[in-house]
Amino acid sequence: MKKYFITLSALLAFISFYAQETNDISLDKKVMQQALRYGDNTIAANSLYNIIAKEGANSVHKDSLAYLYFNGRNYSSCFMVCSDILSRDGNKQEIIEMQAISLEKLGAIEKAAQVYAKLVVKSNNNYHAYKLANLYFAVKKYDESYRAVKKAQELNDTGEIKVTYAVNKNYNQQVALLAAISNLKGLIEFEQDKMELAKTSFKKAIELQADFVLAKENLQAVIEGKQVKKE
């Protein structure tokens, strides 16, 4: 009986030790950090999957996996991870934004617009509203785009965000967000055949940034009755 008790105790101790070992994520974290230092995203992702498996469905490391996929431009996997995270906590704005950008990069423009629409409600961020207006404009939903761009104008601007425009094959221009919003508003008004309003919006964009090449070209196009340049 004593021998049996010792054997059973040893077995229970082994099981307890094994459970601690399998649930210990410190080694996985070390491997992940080392992999990231060496630029090996595949190993880093594998380590994160091990951590998530040990922590369970609510693992906070799913956020890290989403960021890893996003930074690696693996937008399909990023979208899937973000969807899983948001099914448990729909208030994570950075995760919502990554989901929206992933959809846009995958060419699912209307679905991306739906996600941005949810994000704008939560963030009250004028850049998010601008992105929403741009996506609606891309799929020719001009009324929805106009409402979104007017919302973008109403929201607070930090003055920190720039939008990049391709002026030509060799030159990109950084433009203040408020100027970009006014230019987009002019484009929408042009498509709605509101030429005087379009001129006013393009002029406003130039007032906000005097060297805004595309806005200048669009204003001149409206004056001359020509086609404007799209975003």
Task: List where the protein language model places each region.
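Register position in tetratricopeptide repeats
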Residues: R37-Y38, N71-G72, K105-L106, A138-V139, ...
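Terminal, low-structured helical/coil segments at or just beyond the last alpha-helical repeat
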Residues: N172-E231
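Canonical tetratricopeptide repeat
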Residues: S64, M98-I101, K131, Y165, ...
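Residue-level recognition of tetratricopeptide repeat
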Residues: Q33, Y67, I101, N134-L135, ...
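Short coil turns that delineate tetratricopeptide repeat
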Residues: G56, G90, S123-N124, D157, ...
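N-terminal leader/linker segments that initiate helical-solenoid repeat arrays
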Residues: Y18-S64, M80
